[in-house]
A protein has these predicted regions:
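A short, flexible low-complexity segment enriched in Lys/Arg and Gly/Pro that occurs
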Residues: 4-24, 70, 187-194, 226-237, ...
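Activity-critical C-terminal alpha-helical subdomain
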Residues: 14, 263-300
């Protein structure tokens, strides 16, 4: 699914339509992406025009266990580097696998770093690509490779992945989950993932982890009691270190969740040279600063 256009209400009340119904366009500035990335600071999006993808002839899923996170990440890197057509590559670390297994009462599955694959295409092409991914996984010490094409069986294979958030939240009575959101070049994921686990241990924090390895994004899901200020302070310090490490490794402070209120200081580190231009755009469209004031950056 691709967003091809928007209807936006501007701060002065004007209504504009961005994008086009055509498959591609080079007409003018890409206002669609500008408003999507503005986090509501430039206007109110009232309509979204979507270009839907056709449902694949066949969808297949697979899982594979690995002795180390390095093995799992290397497998994902090689699958991408070899150009294997794949829809999704998700990763759970050892801690998250153990949490999911306990929460969902899963059987015949190990609490070790695990990759979850999804393939879209014809049945013949999916079968061929599964064989290739299985071989790559085995070359990286992967084991217990399983795959399925039936929807019910696919959901069973991915059950540990689907229950990630609720399994972590259930660790603490009335607890909450703080999610990190760094994204890196795929070649640098291993170093950052290992760093995250090492720093979590130093802080005495549990660090269940889910990664969208196909695009270099991963989240450390940190459970905490909202009444425990000391733990929350440790989590914020941990996140600070992780973000700075990601920037050091040519990554970004947020792959999906956005800047909002709490990552403004890190945006200064990542895009200091670009912020004056962002402010210029903001002032030209929203002179009275009425659209999400204080989000992304402070005007003054």
């Amino acid at each position: 699914t691709v967003i091809s256009g928007l209807t936006v209400v501007l701060p002065n009340g004007d209504i504009i339509n961005t994008g086009s119904r055509t498959k591609k366009t080079s007409a003018g500035y890409n206002l669609t992406n500008l408003f999507i990335g503005s986090e509501g600071t430039l206007g109110i999006i009232t309509e979204v025009q979507l270009r839907l993808s056709p449902i694949p002839e066949s969808i297949m899923s697979a899982v594979c266990h690995f002795p180390t996170l390095e093995n799992a990440v290397q497998t994902a890197q090689q699958v991408i580097q070899y150009g294997v057509p794949i829809a999704r590559i998700e990763m759970l670390n050892k801690d998250q696998m153990g949490i999911s297994i306990n929460y969902s009462k899963l059987k015949d599955i190990e609490a070790v770093p695990t990759l979850f694959f999804e393939f879209h295409g014809s049945e013949a092409s999916n079968n061929e690509n599964i064989k290739i991914v299985e071989e790559i996984s085995k070359d990286n010490n992967g084991s217990s490779f399983k795959w399925a094409k039936d929807l019910e069986e696919r959901n069973k294979l991915w059950k540990a992945r689907w229950d990630v958030y609720y399994s972590v939240k259930a660790l603490i009575n009335n607890g909450r989950v703080y999610s990190t959101d760094v994204c890196l070049p795929i070649s640098n994921i291993t170093e950052c993932v290992n760093y995250a686990e090492e720093q979590a241990k130093k802080f005495g924090l549990r660090a269940p982890m889910v990664g969208h390895l196909g695009d270099g994004n991963f989240h450390v899901l940190l459970p905490f009691d909202p009444e425990n200020k000391e733990t929350y302070k440790k989590i914020r310090e941990f996140n600070d270190l992780l973000i700075n490490k990601a920037l050091e490794l040519k990554g970004t402070i947020t792959g999906e969740h956005g800047v909002g209120l709490h990552k403004k200081e890190y945006l200064l580190k990542e895009h200091a040279d670009n912020i004056p231009l962002m402010k210029l755009i903001k002032r030209s469209i929203d002179q009275n600063n009425i659209m999400n004031p204080g989000k992304i950056f402070d005007l003054n």
